[in-house]
Amino acid sequence: MAAIPSSGSLVATHDYYRRRLGSTSSNSSCGSAEYPGEAIPHHPGLPKADPGHWWASFFFGKSTLPFMATVLESPEHSESAQASTSTITCDLAQKAVGKQQPSGQPGKTTAGPRPE
């Protein structure tokens, strides 16, 4: 919790996003073309925006699987896309059920044909 000094106002210990003292421009925290070089340089402890990072595509909207978007958005492939999705879902569900084992029989699985 922040300590409130006796004067009644909070004082920031680091003003990384403020302009340099003596600036005649506005109070904005962004640099401007009129006053180049006034903004305080990037703090070394903060990460820089680098489009080379793996997570950059989440923010800039780059699709990592462009062929999937084309197939799923195409009306002529809508039935085959839905069929393959349901098949994959069904297969995954069967595999998940197959991996479950009853508590009394540790060596046997519950999926598959039962011997008669």
From Swiss-Prot:
Residues 22-47, 92-116 are annotated as: Disordered. InterPro entries: PPDPF. GO terms for biological process: cell differentiation. The keyword Cell cycle does not apply. Disulfide bonds: none annotated. It comes from the Eukaryota. Residues 23-32 have a biased composition (Low complexity). The modification Phosphoserine is found at residue 9. Keywords: Developmental protein, Differentiation, Phosphoprotein. Probable regulator of exocrine pancreas development. Belongs to the PPDPF family. This is Pancreatic progenitor cell differentiation and proliferation factor.
